[in-house]
Amino acid sequence: MSQHIAKQFDAELEAVRARVLQMGGIVEQQITSAIEVLSTGNIEQCDRIIEADHRVNALEIEIDEQCSHIIARRQPTAIDLRMILTVIKTITDLERIGDEAAKIARMAKNLHERDTLQIPRYREIKNVSEIAVDMLRQSLDAFARLDIAVPAKVVRLDEQVDEEFKTIVRKLITFMMEDPRTISSSLEILWVAKAIERIGDHAKNMSEYVVYLIKGKDVRHVSAEQLEREVEQ
């Protein structure tokens, strides 16, 4: 490969990476806004979050097409090929996170259209959502900086999100048993909590792809301890 073509190839890869980070920024804002409207009940903001999901979907298609063109034209190998595969996997998870954020916005809209005055377990929901957003932010940062030390931290945070989710479920069940009038709103919040738990799972996936990108090893379905040992080798 000539130096000129190599520079073009590097520029194409960098452009794709930049689009992934742009997509990640939109998705991160979606989640933050979706949790906010649970409290505020701003219907217009709910609609904007749902509209942003269309932009995320369009970006996924655009980046996917860019990756297909790069593979066809450049026939990348080794770490360059792993970069393209990592991008394709990452945008799939980002698109699914966007779907979950839009789902939360729709549930918030439903709750406030029914004039629900108190959102059950809102403080816990906000706390766990902040952990999930932090996971997403760290995963995107690891991708941007090729930081192999981050994924194990994200996996540990995912374990925390899973535990928080279980706690919220237990509290909601107790809440519904004590006051059956809260069943409808509590079920909506249960689905919000589940959406946040899934966001954490997708963010964890994204961090694990960074290890694959740098070391060429698949570290899905391993514990944080195993992952730490893997990246130290």
Show where each model-derived region lies.
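Cytosolic, long alpha-helical scaffolding segments
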Residues: 1-233
